[in-house]
Every structure is written in structure tokens, then in C-alpha cells.
């Protein structure tokens, strides 16, 4: 009896083994592990690629931001240098006008810059007075030494000489006063002209500096806006690249997920088919065994 059951079990196993060769091949545990390892490797590669692209986009953004900052710094320094040059030009222009005014005053008065106008006028007055005195003395000598003239004629000549001497002195005083007044007026006119020219030059330089300052501010604002635009563009590029990499990674993961799902379904179908075949084989074996047992029982009775 025990040998009969052993034979039955051996027969069932043999039939099941033969039947299994007719169905689809079932993936083993090692194959599942290899598939999982491949899937994991591809996922890691996709993740590394995503990280690499993200880092590359960050580096590009940093490079563009640094370039924009350097450009803003360069434009600001250029504007500062230009403003300094304008201030220097304005100073030189003002000094040039002042020097020109001094020279014109000296030329208008007829003496050099290092001469004293008041001293020159006094020297001219002293020269005229000295000439008048010498003329008076000479006339007195002529009056006293002219014996052929009468006393009256001599007196008239003396009086005339005195009168002419006084006229010369008065004329010299008047001329000196006129020269002094003319000199003062000329000096005042030249000083006013120099002051006006210097003021004009100062106003022009001030306007030029203001215009340059406005231009500097405008250039700085433009550079800042340009830098902001470039940074925003770089940021958008980074976002687009990151989004594209994420979508690509998601797509690959979905494709791998579908492949793994298909493999699992295929394995399940193979397992179900094998199980069904095995059950059919067992039932058939049971029927065969039962028929053989009944046949032996009938033969034994007979």
C-alpha cells in the first residue's frame, strides 16, 4: 500500500514537470532581482542626470549674475571717473578765466601784473609837478636876468609865468585825477567782467556736472535693470531646464513602471496557467489511480 502511494506521488510529480515545459516560462526570483537591479540603476542614472542638469543651470545662472554685476560695477566706475574729469575741467576752465581777467586788467591799465596801479599814477603826477617846478624856476631866472626889458614887462612875464605854472599844476592835477578815475573805472569794469565770466564758467561747469550726474544715474539704473533682466532670464532658463528634466525623469519612471507591471502580470499569468495545469494533472492522476484501484479490486474479487 505504501509503495502504491509512493508510485502515485512520483507519477504526479513527473506529469507536473512534463506539463510545465508546455507553458510559458516563469521568471525566477533571481531574474526579478536582476530586473529590479536594472530598474534601480536606470532610476539612479536618471536622478544623477537630473542633478547634473540642475547644477549646470545653477552655474549658468551664477555666471550670468556675476557678469551683470561686473557690468554694473564697470559702468558705475566709468560714470564716476567721467564726473571727476568734468569737475577737473570746470576747475581748470575757471582758473583760466581768472588768469585771463588779470592779464586783461594789466594790459588795459598799461602796466604789468606785478606793478602797483596807484604807485604808477603817483609817479606820473610827481613827474608832471617836477616839470612844472623846473619851468617856473627857469622863467624866474629869465625874468630877473632880462635887463633890456622894463620892470613892467618883467612883472608881466613873471605873472604870466606864475599863471602858466599854476595852470600846468592844475592841469597836471586834473589829468592825474582823470587818470586815477579812469584807472579805477577800468579796473572795476574788468573785475566785473572777470567776475561775470567766472560766474558763467562756474554755471556752465555746474550744469555740465549735473548733466553728467543725471547721465551717471541713468546709466546706473539702466545697468541695474539690464542685470535684473538677465538674472530673470537666467532664472527662467533654469526653471525650464529643471522642469524639463523632471518631466523626462517622470516619463522614464512611468515607462519603467509600466514595463515592471507588464512583467509582473506576465509572471502571474504564467503562474496561474501552471497552477491550473498542475491541478488538472492531479485530478487526472487521481482519476487514473481511482480507476486502476477499482479495476484491481474487481480483479481481486473475481
Curated annotation (Swiss-Prot):
Residues 34-70, 79-93, 205-286 have a biased composition (Basic and acidic residues). It comes from the Eukaryota. Residues 25-93, 168-193, 205-302 are annotated as: Disordered. GO terms for biological process: response to water deprivation. This is a SET 5a protein. Belongs to the LEA type 1 family. LEA protein are late embryonic proteins abundant in higher plant seed embryos. There are two subsets of LEA proteins (5a and 5b), the first ones are expressed when the cotyledon weight reach 80 mg and the second set are expressed above 100 mg. The function of those proteins is not known. This is Late embryogenesis abundant protein D-29.
